[in-house]
Amino acid sequence: METKRLTQRSMVFVLAGGRGSRLKELTDRRVKPAVPFGGKARIIDFALSNALNSGIRKMAIATQYKAHSLIRHLQRGWTFFRAERNEFLDILPASQRTGTEAWYAGTADAVTQNIDIVDSYDVDYVIILAGDHIYKMDYEVMLREHVETGADVTVGCLTVPRMEATAFGVMATDETGKITSFLEKPADPPAMPDDPNSALASMGIYVFKWSFLRELLVADALDTNSSHDFGHDLIPEIVENGKAMAHRYDRSCVRADGAPVYWKDVGTVDAFWEAHIDLTNFTPDLDLWDKNWPIWTYSESVPPAKFIHDERDRRGMAISSMVAGGCIISGTEVRNSCLFTGVHTNSYAVLDHAVVLPNVVVNRHARLRKVVVDSDVVVPEGLVVGEDPTEDAKWFRVSERGVTLITQDMLDKRAQAQ
């Protein structure tokens, strides 16, 4: 089968229902895949853009937890598919479609409850994706590899520090790339044979032939001992009784020559902040400026960013920073920061190593250092954060690495107490 034909007969099924509780208050109002990232996009845009850039125009998104923000984003920004060419992006909320009163019970169950819908798509291959990671990957390479090896499942994988592997599925392979063992989120991850400090971790990306996966899902649904999860149940079953192959991410990672392999789980406040600060570097690890592999998203119709005032201590300026459209930097010093769409800052304020989500207002004389500010926050005049950790911890959430998360609810409680 030709490669072009492979992508035309394939779809992606994106699992986008998880809260992402490690992001703390950032996911109080929205599901993790809907969290803004990179100045104007959402986290889910990376998985969807990878599919689109790989030539796959059949997409289904399973949603569950606080999905309104995500659904609104998809409806506004991902409506360019042509139904007459059998292109689509379908949103599949948990809706008890199997006749039971249960919502999605696990990652595999999210597909099981939509078996009839996937049947109607008439595809040969299904790529299961997590909707909450930041990376650029050509799924076509992995899909072709899956077909050529005759695997029952192909699992995307990459090398991670062993002590961080407790959050992932961890596998071992033989010299052919066949997976010989698979442990989901082990307390003591096994090391790679040639590197005691590293482990081979699953990316949560799986390629199946639909007919094979369908049979597996039907059997799993009848298993009362199953948690109905790909990592805990289905993948170990195939490793033991079938042919599971590992696909090394470095073979399909989209990057410039000599650039590092980039894949981030921005699932903590620290990781979220660090990924954004990296974007302000001279040569960031993640290239958002690659016209050959664009990150598609919904773009508001807003004017360009504007910088106002040029006086001592009242100069609208941004150094080593990303400033999105619709921002007004009025007499504010911005350094090593990422400002999302529609941020307005006022005179004598300072933003240093700050990640400021959309539609935030920063009032005069505020000083914010090493912070993440949630969307729609109004920062009061004279607020100082990032200089006194003890004081910050009284009102805001301070992470293990000293990043302070600020939300409107936190500011309201602070104002009421003073």
From Swiss-Prot:
According to UniProt, this protein's pathway is: Glycan biosynthesis; glycogen biosynthesis
Biological process GO terms, please?
A: glycogen biosynthetic process
Give me the residues that bind alpha-D-glucose 1-phosphate, please. Answer: Y104, G169, E184, K185, S202
- Lineage top rank: taxon: Bacteria
Coiled-coil intervals, chain numbering? none
UniProt EC number: 2.7.7.27
Is Nucleotide-binding given among the entry's keywords? yes
Cited InterPro entries? ADP-Glc_PPase, ADP_Glu_pyroP_CS, GlgC_bac, GlmU/GlgC-like_hexapep, NTP_transferase_dom, Nucleotide-diphossugar_trans, Trimer_LpxA-like_sf
Protein task: Involved in the biosynthesis of ADP-glucose, a building block required for the elongation reactions to produce glycogen. Catalyzes the reaction between ATP and alpha-D-glucose 1-phosphate (G1P) to produce pyrophosphate and ADP-Glc.
| Subunit-structure text | Homotetramer.
| Protein's recorded name | Glucose-1-phosphate adenylyltransferase
Q: What is the originating organism of this protein?
A: Jannaschia sp. (strain CCS1)
Q: Which gene encodes it?
A: glgC
